């Protein structure tokens, strides 16, 4: 199944795009590696949002950050059986030279879940 992410306005990000991807992936990996977290009872998306926001705040306090995670259960979906539709729109009033948005798709083949992550930054 092919899920496409169309990027927003990330050219003015407080971090390079590669660093944002690494930050998201490392946050997710640390959740999976933490034996004290029971992911069957804890919300993976809420924990991921918390970790990503904590790391972003350490990089720059000049911005306010917003993180959103949409979780898709992709178990049993394939090219012939892709029977779901998802639409998510977001709007903001911002200064285009300082503020922006970054979208990223994170797939976990072991749990059959896909996370669509959106990060927004607004200059203070």
From Swiss-Prot:
Taxonomic superkingdom: Eukaryota
UniProt keyword terms in alphabetical order: Cell projection, Cytoplasm
Location, primary (coarse class): cytoplasm
InterPro entries linked to this entry: Tctex-1-like_sf
UniProt subcellular location: Cytoplasm; Cell projection
Gene Ontology, cellular component aspect: cell projection; cytoplasm
Keyword Cytoplasm among record annotations: yes
Keyword Cytoplasm: yes
Family: Belongs to the TDA2 family.
Protein name, UniProt field: Topoisomerase I damage affected protein 2
Organism listed in the record: Saccharomyces cerevisiae (strain FostersB) (Baker's yeast)
Organism phylogeny: Eukaryota, Fungi, Dikarya, Ascomycota, Saccharomycotina
